Amino acid sequence: MFLYNLTLQRATGISFAIHGNFSGTKQQEIVVSRGKILELLRPDPNTGKVHTLLTVEVFGVIRSLMAFRLTGGTKDYIVVGSDSGRIVILEYQPSKNMFEKIHQETFGKSGCRRIVPGQFLAVDPKGRAVMISAIEKQKLVYILNRDAAARLTISSPLEAHKANTLVYHVVGVDVGFENPMFACLEMDYEEADNDPTGEAAANTQQTLTFYELDLGLNHVVRKYSEPLEEHGNFLITVPGGSDGPSGVLICSENYITYKNFGDQPDIRCPIPRRRNDLDDPERGMIFVCSATHKTKSMFFFLAQTEQGDIFKITLETDEDMVTEIRLKYFDTVPVAAAMCVLKTGFLFVASEFGNHYLYQIAHLGDDDEEPEFSSAMPLEEGDTFFFQPRPLKNLVLVDELDSLSPILFCQIADLANEDTPQLYVACGRGPRSSLRVLRHGLEVSEMAVSELPGNPNAVWTVRRHIEDEFDAYIIVSFVNATLVLSIGETVEEVTDSGFLGTTPTLSCSLLGDDALVQVYPDGIRHIRADKRVNEWKTPGKKTIVKCAVNQRQVVIALTGGELVYFEMDPSGQLNEYTERKEMSADVVCMSLANVPPGEQRSRFLAVGLVDNTVRIISLDPSDCLQPLSMQALPAQPESLCIVEMGGTEKQDELGERGSIGFLYLNIGLQNGVLLRTVLDPVTGDLSDTRTRYLGSRPVKLFRVRMQGQEAVLAMSSRSWLSYSYQSRFHLTPLSYETLEFASGFASEQCPEGIVAISTNTLRILALEKLGAVFNQVAFPLQYTPRKFVIHPESNNLIIIETDHNAYTEATKAQRKQQMAEEMVEAAGEDERELAAEMAAAFLNENLPESIFGAPKAGNGQWASVIRVMNPIQGNTLDLVQLEQNEAAFSVAVCRFSNTGEDWYVLVGVAKDLILSPRSVAGGFVYTYKLVNNGEKLEFLHKTPVEEVPAAIAPFQGRVLIGVGKLLRVYDLGKKKLLRKCENKHIANYISGIQTIGHRVIVSDVQESFIWVRYKRNENQLIIFADDTYPRWVTTASLLDYDTVAGADKFGNICVVRLPPNTNDEVDEDPTGNKALWDRGLLNGASQKAEVIMNYHVGETVLSLQKTTLIPGGSESLVYTTLSGGIGILVPFTSHEDHDFFQHVEMHLRSEHPPLCGRDHLSFRSYYFPVKNVIDGDLCEQFNSMEPNKQKNVSEELDRTPPEVSKKLEDIRTRYAF
């Protein structure tokens, strides 16, 4: 078995975010890392929408990311620390839309090791040097400079190693143009290591160490080191030189401290806490991330606590000495992994979990009522300040980037009866969790919908003048009339436009600079800017059946297949070409391309005929109306559309930006198939046809504009958009009802919209999330969802949600009540009334936990609910709250053979589980009966067990439960579940159970799979085979009777199969005659499974399912990852295909090595050598390579570049999208 890996949705969780001017213009951009992906985002300063410019897989782990700019430069570069053992400097090239690797310096081994640098990066604020550090011992400094041609140069590394030292954080200190300086949080463990009593370990202090790079001596000196009172977790650089006092802020538990060289005394300020917080008051508070904003006249920091509260931090200075730190509560946003304050006044928040946000900073919070806390305020040691959290005041949310991270569980099923299956994804963490329903398609936002007096048959938009940015009219054609609407603040009917209203319209367009043309069955109407009208009438009894129009040309087809061609002359007059062309059959459809910039006309006309052919006809004056080429079609054409797509932006001599693309002829057939063919711009030849089935109706095509480029809207029983995005073609369905006719639409509110008709309504639509594979509907949940099952009859979901370090609703209410009573008791006689009012206000206050976070209850505190949800509407049908410290870990829905048709839900619950050091007071299996057509849970009984029941699976009318490391069969009893049989030989802890026939495949938490056979006659569970590798299995899926696919904690997927000669009729040998080694107890079972495939995904996979994703497609193995990625593994059906893709992968490894310097083969073999899997993500980078490299690779394969692209596209569309 050979598999091909494809990513459907890239990871969405963000681990690092940096901002700068990476394209060299004044625009602010953000570069984010998503594990093994680098992405460049650009927030639009006018609309606030975030656009993705570029996404690159780096096939390595990005451990750190920094932006820097050389002194006096205008462009920011990106430094990447990864697991490749190399430092890489990247530059963004806007003309090619790619990251270019400028430098790659090797300094150590690959992999995330503790003494190989790459974990921390720090840059001198003036861009003169960069320090790259490991977690332990090694630090290297590189000097950055320019050569004579103004190219960036990098020195050889200077060492600043210190053995036996752990590093917690590194930053560059702003010292102006003095010698560059770096500050590190370090801890020396040498004494602690050598002291057997443990005293030294208890007394070890963290130190703040400054390293200076002496540019004169080309040497790094350890300048200064001092011990810290509290344990710091990160550092913030304070602007220096002419901008500020320099130095660093140390964020530590409960305190923020300012430190600098020389006479500067330490200034420290406690971190304010929330008033009346339900958290444990003994728990420390830390800052988790920060952002700095600096202008010529001032600077401030925004720092976020682990509850999500942002504080604005300012420093008061007296000359060059800092005298106080001031903190002011700013706003509360979800806890972030990184924050960026952009110069355009935006705050980008990359959330740790869940969606990411872009906020506009509306106020700086200087002049409001909020109290300001200062280091100068007197406080007792151990006391702190208190503040009151509130909804957003200084920030305004302008955009939200959907993120599925973390996906904890996923099932694929067509519960909504839509033919195409939906993905039901349990994602998020704590109160920000959600169940999301993903459907393949682009999200459509409805701008306006209005009823029309009848059912129209077509719609167009036209501009009044070629220079206009927005459309002026919408023209709607009915069976016997034409309606003209003007576009302004509102859309209203106009009568003086010059259009003929008493006839249907076949087409209309802007002609020349400022004239309009209307083609109707009896003729052509040319309306000049001064409302003069020229008419051309059809000869005799003939009428116009089809037409094609662009800015300068009109072609019409009369009944009987006669073509008449008109072209506009320089005076703006429409002139008929002297000859007419008789076609051999009736014309069904026609298309002209837009006139290319700087040319007189479009050279080609495409005509589709009844005889199942498309013909390309020249419109060049030298051979006008001569046929150039022809393509036979599998069915009759319905519509044609010539577009220029896939262009790269180029600047001409005058600095005008234009794009040079390829001409594509799109052909929509009557059988619902879309063909895309390349049209040669010189000869008119047609080549390289791609085919996709779109739906059951004939396909109509319309040209629209998306992100400044031409795109094609194709309408069948579903509407599809074909567009080029990040140098790849996408053909994606719209998640919207069926449309009948459409046209591009541009107005002030909606610069790139679509106007469309559906039955008797006119709709204005916008597509904002181009490039998105899925559109999603999210239903909020209360705690982190762990698993869910689908009730087969009602299609409802039964979800278990469990959170550690959390209170149940009942405990929360009880704690609040208790705190309110304490408030009243603590008040003196005269303050009783006020205290009672405050207590009442506190009890009524309800800040949403999805924004303000849930209170942290402490270790060993658990909260759980069991929820029954309707997956289509998303409403909760039933909710069972478990008691405090009961944690639900497993759920199953099953029938028992002795109870007939009733369905039961079993939930495995742990009691008082402490994770480290692990201890548990036991567990329960709750049994519920599903009543009310699967909408309500009726409690039957609970069965006590000794350990955590972490896996439950229905099995032959009974149920299998993994209790710790015991595998048991239970049956339903009146008072509890009855134990029928057990096996004690599983190694550690059962994390999953799959069943097929009499076989049971058990996943162990760290010992891979164990095959068990149930013998009904002897009522025994007998182990007959296992795996030879230790795998920390997270999820598994059966592929057939002998084969199982599994994923582990470290990001690998494997497929394991039992050899054909495996015998599962083994006995436990009650006689004892068998030799000891035959039993195989020393090294597991006597029979071993074979590994068929191994592959390192690079993200922890938490669900696997064998399913089909598109109607009529083949089966594939779909996986989802903790980082929010969704991918598939698909089997090759022929040896030729496998051989071809193996060669593509081999050539790309050498021709197009990964961006951050990691070797592709060793990345995919991180833990086990990659076996029988070809990496489709690498193969698909073929399309983004430079044309000459594409040519070299395809020549090696004896193909042309379009043929290779077509193979890549075909394998993707056969299984997915």
Curated annotation (Swiss-Prot):
> Site described as Interaction with SF3B1, positions?
N988, K1171
Annotated compartments: Nucleus
Q: Which residues carry this modification: Phosphoserine?
A: S156
> Where are the stretches annotated Interaction with PHF5A, SF3B1 and SF3B5?
105-119, 145-168
Would you say which domain of life the source belongs to?
Eukaryota
Q: What is known of its domains?
A: The core of the protein consists of three beta-propeller domains.
Role according to the record: Component of the 17S U2 SnRNP complex of the spliceosome, a large ribonucleoprotein complex that removes introns from transcribed pre-mRNAs. The 17S U2 SnRNP complex (1) directly participates in early spliceosome assembly and (2) mediates recognition of the intron branch site during pre-mRNA splicing by promoting the selection of the pre-mRNA branch-site adenosine, the nucleophile for the first step of splicing.
The protein in question is named: Splicing factor 3B subunit 3
User: Which species is the source of this protein?
Assistant: Mus musculus (Mouse)
Q: Which gene encodes it?
A: Sf3b3
